[in-house]
Curated annotation (Swiss-Prot):
Main subcellular location of this protein, as a coarse class: mitochondrion
Gene designation per UniProt: RRG9
Pfam families recorded: Neugrin
One GO CC term, this protein: nucleus
Region (Disordered): 37-70, 126-166, 285-316
Keyword terms: Mitochondrion, Transit peptide
Comp. bias (Low complexity): 37-55, 130-166, 293-306
Designated name of the protein: Required for respiratory growth protein 9, mitochondrial
Localization (cell): Mitochondrion
Amino acid sequence: MLSQCFRSSLAKHCFVAKNQALHGKFVNSIMCLSSSSSNSGSSNSNSNSGSSNSNIRYNDNYRSNDDGTNFEELQLPSALKSETESLNGKGKNKLSKRPQTLLEALIESHGTLPEEVDEPKITRNVASESATSATSATSATSATSATSATSATSATSATSATSATSTTTIITTTATVPVENNVSTPYWVKRELTMKAKHSQWNPKKKLSREDMLKLRELKENFPHYKTVELAELFRVSPEAVRRILKSNWVPNDIDEDRIIARREKQKQKRQQEIQLKKLEFISNRGKKNVSSRPQQRQQQQPKQQQRQRSKVGYKNGFAFNEKYGGLGNKF
């Protein structure tokens, strides 16, 4: 790179001094500088920054016009300025002396040739780039995850707080507000539910007789320390039934009692007669077949069954050894 810079800058100088007599000397100086620059360029690969540190910008020293003959002076050292002025015939030294070569001008200005600054080689390491990209990605993801985690924790805390408050409010409301029946339930289910809700307390498993009710009252009068729950377990009824019996003002009447006793006796006799009739019918229907005591419908059906059986080939009611059975000719 440094050799290319020297060559480009010196080519411009050679273009200016192509009609001068010292063209050969410039060519020699170019060869010297090119050899020195090639040797120095082999030691260090990056030389753009080194050439900038030497305060000599060979690429940007001159700016040429369209025809390439005239150049503008931009930034040059004093030695190079004098050289260019002597070559172009503008300065005090109008070829009065032998013009200095570029190598001599550089030696005068710097004492020695500008040494290249050693800079670290910029080599593209794919592994390091991938590592840096990975670290940057992990840092970015960690940052995003941290922010998301913080936001998630804040959101969860907020939601938990709101849910806690909502649960507390729900508990308080459910404790006070009664539960309404579901609209989708049919009317007969609602009716049963309402009846159970109304009459759940008054739901005795059996009805007590008047004698039992009198006994219950006597027990409570003689033993007041008995509780309603204990009396309900003793008579096998609900506690509410015991409470209503004790609170009622019913008093048994002798006339009513005689009437009730007579009615019960009649019901008992009727029930016994029905049981005896059922027994007689069962005994009468249990007789042999084709008996006159059997119903008429059964007498008409029995001969038909016998005719069907006798119509079969080799019909016999039973079978015996060494005889045909069922027309199959098998002998047993």
